[in-house]
Amino acid sequence: MMNLSELAPDYIRAIQPYQPGKPISELVRDLGLNKDEVVKLASNENPLGTSPLAKEAMIQALNESARYPDGSGFELKAALSERLGMPADQIVLGNGSNDVLELATRIFLHPDSTAIYSQYAFAIYPLLAQAVGARGIAVPARNYGHDLEAMLAAVTPETRIIFIANPNNPTGTLCDARDLLRFMERVPQDVLVILDEAYDEYLPEANKANSIAWLKNFQNLVITRTFSKAYGLASVRVGFALAHADIANLMNRIRQPFNVNSIGLAAAQAALKDVEFVKLAYMTNRTGMQQMTHGLDQLGIEYIPSFGNFVCCHIDGHPANTLKIYRNLLQQGVIVRPLGNYDMLNHLRVTIGIEEENKRFLQALEQALKELD
């Protein structure tokens, strides 16, 4: 009997599925733990939950569940246009920012092309390139971040996309705005630069690149953002891209007709209005980062200075020690993110939680380190 999977292209069959952070429900099933006692610090979610305004909007949107959503996302795009100072025809909505990343990839990459990203880039980038048969080029990192000069040097006539996450996930590093602007000025105009700003809301104003203003001068720039992080809407999947009108038009042509659901549209529009909630998320993260890094210092654990809502910890010794620590934390009801799929075998990524969650992690880590000895 024919194995139909063999008819798929080799590059599709070679794909390794993306591994998300372990869900709380899975840990409860596996270890029989009480759900309320589990602390999840694995997926860079907002520990404050969701904006009250967004919650109310979602409840109201449920009344229209039998209706298809507005496929154009007119009202959300209008709200984003007003907030960001961008024409609505330069905004593309997506089912999370991963969706708009994939749209750009499908348009510009093909089996004879290449995509460039950093060694420790978001794991989705190489998957997106592989899914269309393009060749991914991982440029060696510089201090766990982007080496922009090396990325420029890696550009060839076959290069169609360069991915840059700023701040970077999973390392939390940040490219200086001036360096990024000089980079954009030197990138060939026929190479699309995708600037993934999923964690932009966690940056102090002094560190923000003001990249939206660059769109006027660089037609080859696409900026992606999400409502999953600071806005606390990870489960309803809403993201967006900002691009030159011609590129946005192409992205809108190939996206699914109703790629953002009604509940997500309503929640995102309401969340945009809740400025105080986002400010609180920012301040909670700053305070939590100080608590977390102070605790790691006390334990003698090295970490990568982070501009996101997470911190990347280094566990000394053989990589097996890192897995032992990870599993021990699970036994204690604390979920963090191992980074073996990033070839960071001695690292764990930890989301910044509220004070009690951070304390719980640090106590569990201290216990795990003792048991490792």
UniProtKB/Swiss-Prot annotation:
The keyword tRNA-binding does not apply. Disulfide bonds: none annotated. SUPFAM superfamilies: PLP-dependent transferases. One of its GO terms (biological process) is L-histidine biosynthetic process. It catalyses: L-histidinol phosphate + 2-oxoglutarate = 3-(imidazol-4-yl)-2-oxopropyl phosphate + L-glutamate. Keywords: Amino-acid biosynthesis, Aminotransferase, Histidine biosynthesis, Pyridoxal phosphate, Transferase. Belongs to the class-II pyridoxal-phosphate-dependent aminotransferase family. Histidinol-phosphate aminotransferase subfamily. The lineage of its organism: Bacteria, Pseudomonadati, Pseudomonadota, Betaproteobacteria, Nitrosomonadales. Its cofactor is pyridoxal 5'-phosphate. The gene is hisC2. It comes from Nitrosomonas europaea (strain ATCC 19718 / CIP 103999 / KCTC 2705 / NBRC 14298). Pathway: Amino-acid biosynthesis; L-histidine biosynthesis; L-histidine from 5-phospho-alpha-D-ribose 1-diphosphate: step 7/9. Gene3D superfamilies: Aspartate Aminotransferase, domain 1, Type I PLP-dependent aspartate aminotransferase-like (Major domain). The keyword Amino-acid biosynthesis applies. One of its GO terms (molecular function) is histidinol-phosphate transaminase activity. This is Histidinol-phosphate aminotransferase 2. Pfam families: Aminotran_1_2. Homodimer. The modification N6-(pyridoxal phosphate)lysine is found at residue 229. Its EC number is 2.6.1.9.
